[in-house]
Amino acid sequence: MELWYTEQHTEDVRFSIKVDNQLYSGQSEFQRIDVFESKEFGKFFTLDGLMMVTEKDEFIYHDMITHIPMATNPKIKNVLVIGAGDGGTVRELTRYETIENIDMVEIDKLVVDICKEYLPQTASKLEDPRVHIYYEDGLKFVRTKENEYDLIIVDSTDPFGPGEGLFTKEFYGNCFKALKEDGILVNQHESPYYASYAKSMKRAHKRIKEFFPICKVYQAHIPTYPSGHWLFGFASKKYDPIEDLNSEAWNALGLQTKYYNTDLHMGCFALPNYVKELLEKEEE
C-alpha cells in the first residue's frame, strides 16, 4: 500500500509527497510533530500537518533568511533567532566567525530534540559554544530586551497556533526596541499567491512598516511551501539591503552556498507586479 503525505494549501488545492516511512509522530504541549522519509525530498518534518523542513530544499530557505542580512552588514556580532527549532538558520549563522553570540528562542523543546535526532543536517550546529537556547515564548523574551542585537531573525511558523504572537504589532515594536541603532530584522513573510497567505503577508508588512524606516520584501522559490513562491521581510533602522550590500566583503569570506549569491541578492528584491500591488494596498 502506498503512503502519501498530503497538505491542504487552500480549500481547493492539496500538495502530496509519496512517503517511504513515518519515522516519528508525537504531540508536544504546543503542537503535533511528525517526521517522514521520502525518496524525492529525503527526511522532512511537519508541525500540525504543515511542512517545515525537507532535507532536499531546506538550503533555499536557510540561505535566504540568513545571508541576505549578513551580506548587507558583515559586521553583525550579536544575533537573536526566534523559532528556528530545526537549527538550519543557526547552522548558517555559525559559519560566520565574526558572530560572537547567537540567542535562539524556541517555545517547544520537543521540536529541537526531534530535529537533533532525525534531522542532523539542519540541527548540527546547535551545540556551538556561541549558541544559547532559551525554551520560551519569543514574544515574552523580546519584551525584556533593549538596544541589544545587531540582527533579529524571526524564523517562525505560520501566524496561528504557537507562532501567532510573532505576527503582532506589539512583537514588531519590541523587536525594534531590542535592536541596536543600526539593527536589522528579517522574517519569513508568507506567500503572496494564495489569498489566505497573502492576507497574513500584507498584515505583517503593514505592522513592520509602522516601526522601521527601511522596509523591503524579497523572494525565493521553495518547492515544498504553499505555491512555491515565498517571501521574506527585511526591515532596518539604517541599512538598505540593496544600496548597502557589501558584495566584496561577503565574497571575500569564501563561504560556499548552494542557493545564495550576491547577484541573487540584488535580484530577489525585484518583485512581480501583483506582489507590489498587494504590498501597496492597505490591509482591509
Swiss-Prot record:
Any one cellular-component term (Gene Ontology): cytosol
Binding site for spermidine: 62, 86, 155-158
Annotated catalysed reactions: S-adenosyl 3-(methylsulfanyl)propylamine + putrescine = S-methyl-5'-thioadenosine + spermidine + H(+)
GO biological process entries: spermidine biosynthetic process
Family indicated by similarity: Belongs to the spermidine/spermine synthase family.
Assembly and binders: Homodimer or homotetramer.
Name recorded for this polypeptide: Polyamine aminopropyltransferase
UniProt source species: Alkaliphilus oremlandii (strain OhILAs) (Clostridium oremlandii (strain OhILAs))
Gene from which the chain derives: speE
